[in-house]
């Protein structure tokens, strides 16, 4: 785990106009799948400016909060992360007291000494995606021939690959199958544990309008 400080800013994010095109794509594969349509719709960025494992790109600004329970965006070179209010709701609630009701009144750290540590909070970056489909299918075939696949066969395949590739990297390695087993991918993650609350509006503002749109759209 990296020892760096990340500052969480919980905000209400307003909806914006969106195209009717639907679907979700892996960021590592968007170049061939959806980029031509994105460019046609007016996108000015080059593929390498959106996803790049070797150089700075837009993907480096996107984080998973608490292992994927929420998402956020890095908006400064000091590690400031902005996220939805509901992602930090439980943390704000746990930090609140009758004397300092941050949930109802909001909170802003005007100086670094005012930041509030969020115990157990994590932010995670995706650093690399590796296609291991051929190797995974070979492992699966071998397990089937040995009659040792069992009902947890897919998890066995994941475990073999995670152990093989996870030992020589500082990142966390997680295997997953996509498109009903047609693709097997390894995801390399970098997780930071020193996360601190620096700002949150009062709950009446942060949670205004409820969560209907949030759970209805990706």
Task: Briefly describe each language-model feature range.
Residues 4-14:
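Sec-dependent N-terminal signal peptides
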